[in-house]
Every structure is written in C-alpha cells, then in structure tokens.
Amino acid sequence: MAKKKEKKGAQGLKVVKGKLKIEPGKPAKVISSTQAFEVPLFRVFTDEVQEAGEEKPVRRDIIRHNGSVVILAVDDSKSKKDPLIVIERQYRHAAEQFLYEVPAGKVDDGEDRLAAAKRELIEETGFRAKKWTRLTRYFASPGFLGEWMQVFLAEGLTAGDAEPEADEKLEIYQVPLSEVLRLIDAGKIRDGKTLVSVMLYARLRKKKKRD
C-alpha cells in the first residue's frame, strides 16, 4: 500500500496528497472545573486544562449540553425526482430574525437519540415516519459548545396533529428539494443544521444515482 504523501509548507503546514488520516488524539487533562451557570437547557463551566503540546494550563469556558437531534423529513410519494422537505419557520431571538429550518430538538436526560427524533418530529410538525436512517453527527460550535447534533433521515411520512411546546410558534412547510437548494445557494437559508442535513442528503442522492 502506498504511503500518504505529505509535503511540509510554510510554518509547518502539511499538504496532503491522497487520504488524510484522522487522528482524534487524547483529551486534555482537566486540572479544575467550576460550574459558573445553569439553566434548563445547558450548563456553563470554567475549566483549567493542560492541552497536548502546551507548557502551561489554559482556561476554557464551555457550555455542556445533552445534545440535539436533527430530522430531515422527506416525502417522495408525489415525486421521487424532487421530494418534499419539511421546513419550519420560526423566530430565533439570538439571531434576531426568522429562520427556515428542518425540525430539531434537545435530547432529554437518559433519552435515546432515535426516540428523541421521533418525539420531536411529532411535537413540532405532527408527522410520523416509517423509516429512520442515521445520516451523520457533528459538533455545532466546538470552540465553546460541547453539543453533538445527530442528523436523522425520516421517510414514509404520515401527517398528524402537532404538539408544540407553549413557547414554540412554528409555521410548517413542505418544500421541494430543488427549491430548498436554490434558497441555500441564494443565501436565504442561514441555519447550520439545515445546511448540513440538506446538502449531505442531496450529495448522497447524486452518489446513489451514479452507483
């Protein structure tokens, strides 16, 4: 097997030709950890840690979160070529604007992620799905937020009554995939989880057609 070819550039930069070997490495050594703040959704900690390659400990302010599930709900009953994607419109105070998003929600303490995804889809949209597939998972903003986002593909949809929480004001749409992609290209969809899930799904569809 041919070895990975690497060429060192300026300031230790490595230019990889071929496959990049993914090396997660070891976690930093936590010297101290103090909880600074807590609300129902998350907890804030100030940690003093010794990171690999560093001579002195550093301070890291981080948010601990149970993690979230993201649901890409797809209805291809009317069109296999251009299926409908469930999209929500809701106001996000942190962003100070209305955003168009796929359904998502927090995982409760001790809750299985698939069970959480099924619960959130029903609560927010009323839809139930016959087929569930794990697409990917990623960190939302790992510089300070320890939140995993688990993305599920939900297919074989059946409509029902939504059961949103009291503070959730949602408008629910079913939008053709081609239109969602057009809005992404135009910069009109600005929600990260929606960008990740829709663009990954579109890529997998293209790959499946080629295969």
Please identify what each model-predicted range represents:
Residues 2-28, 98, 109, 134, ...:
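Nudix hydrolase/Nudix homology domain
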Residues 13, 20, 25, 60-65, ...:
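Conserved Nudix-box catalytic region and its N-terminal flanking loop in Nudix hydrolases
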Residues 43-47, 98, 148-150, 171:
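Short beta-strand micro-motifs in enzyme catalytic cores
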Residues 32-72, 76:
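Acidic, metal-coordinating catalytic segment for phosphate/diphosphate chemistry
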Residues 58, 69-70, 106-192:
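Unchanged
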Residues 52-54, 75-79, 91, 154-159, ...:
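Short loop segments at secondary-structure junctions
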Residues 35-40, 93, 138-148, 206:
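Acidic pyrophosphate-coordinating catalytic loop
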